[in-house]
Amino acid sequence: MSIFFHEQLYRTNAVMTKLKNYPVTICGAGALGANIAENLARSGFDKLTVIDRDRIEERNLSTQPYYRSDVGAFKAKILANNLYRAIGTKVDAKTKELTPANTTQLLKDSQLIVDVFDNSVARQAVKDYAEKLSVPCLHAGLSADYAEVIWNDVYRVPSEVNDDVCDYPLARNLVMLTVAVACEAIVSFIATAEQRNFSITQKDLTVQSLFL
């Protein structure tokens, strides 16, 4: 029996084949990126790349799928190791900082980019690359009790004043809500080519479609 037996019953064989063979690059392996990577891998995606230069800190453990024994190690490497041990998925882990100078090198094989970086410079570099090469790109971000999941053509990069994301309030439930919405938007796009934008608000548990 397949590891993805239940997902396959829900999605159909045709969709599962698409998911397995669709190259996806996730930019960031923090609260959103690591959980999105795990969710996609456990949903049947088999061609994942994760880019993140950061190392695991103790404060990451409540919102990111890492262990105390992982503190100090590269997020992308540990994520790749954990997913291979769990379900045999081989994730291409790149422990590099993405900059405007190396976007082509790091993103060149992507058919879909998921941007969950925590700084505006990297987000802008991803957005510009996706626009220039017409690569589908989904951006997801959080602020207080609000989150957005938005495709590149209508996405606006936030100002640098909000870049110090390590110190802002962050609820795990909002992270996981956003992860679920982002992953469903990704699966829906691959299955149907439809690009759907969403907002998520934790206090009133609302997920709304955005028509931008």
Where are these regions (language model features)?
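Gly/Ala-rich phosphate-binding loop of Rossmann-like dinucleotide-binding domains
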Residues: 37, 41
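Glycine-rich phosphate/adenylate-binding loop
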Residues: 105-112, 116-212
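Hydrophobic/small residue at the entry helix of a nucleotide-binding pocket
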Residues: 32
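A structured beta-alpha segment of the ubiquitous adenosine-cofactor-binding alpha/beta core
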Residues: 74-112, 117-123
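Hydrophobic Val/Ile/Leu positions in short beta-strands of Rossmann-like dinucleotide-binding domains
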Residues: 26-29, 50
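N-terminal charged helix/coil linker that caps or initiates catalytic domains
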Residues: 1-25, 141
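Glycine-rich phosphate-binding loop and adjoining beta1-alpha1-beta2 segment
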Residues: 50-86
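Conserved S-adenosyl-L-methionine
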Residues: 42-47
